Amino acid sequence: MTLVSDAMIFAACAHDGMLRKGTNVPYIVHPAEVAAIASTLTDDPEILAAAVLHDVIEDCGVSGQELAQRFGARVAALVLSETQERCGDPRMTWEARKRAAIAQIARGDRASKIIALSDKLSNMRAIRRDFERDGESVFARFHQHDKRRHAWYYRSCASLLKDELGDTDAWRELNEHIGHVFSEDDAESCLQEAAYAG
């Protein structure tokens, strides 16, 4: 069994019974799509394994030590680079967690940025599909209901990923989805909020 297929089986077991927010879609569809997107950017099996495992620490209670023992230290480190800490009321901590995630992207190497781009693109594909069907109500399924804050987060991520990966089809697709879902007004409002808060 290859590292990537072993990681896929592990992730499928870890996410068993979980659904994507506000849908009946099995959660494993998301990490599988993240790995598929990452495979257009690299053939490194450790990056692809980490891509499919990227949510198992954050969402499934798997430890970094367990991942390191099973898949190696680099895979575990890459998954940890994609892991957002949660504490207390998620609505109270959303912005702090997203700021930490943005900081992780900023200091990450190319491997971690490939996973971050793949994750954000998978998420934006789902948001766009649901936005086109359900409109603004799509944001009610998230802990953070304010569309402008999501605009700030995804635009910030795309901006940080541009230098390393802006010449890729994946980045261009991410940027196109962001432009479609989030108007310039949403982004401008969020920039003003961030400047005021900063």
Where are these regions (language model features)?
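Active-site helical microenvironments for divalent-metal-assisted chemistry
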Residues: 1-198
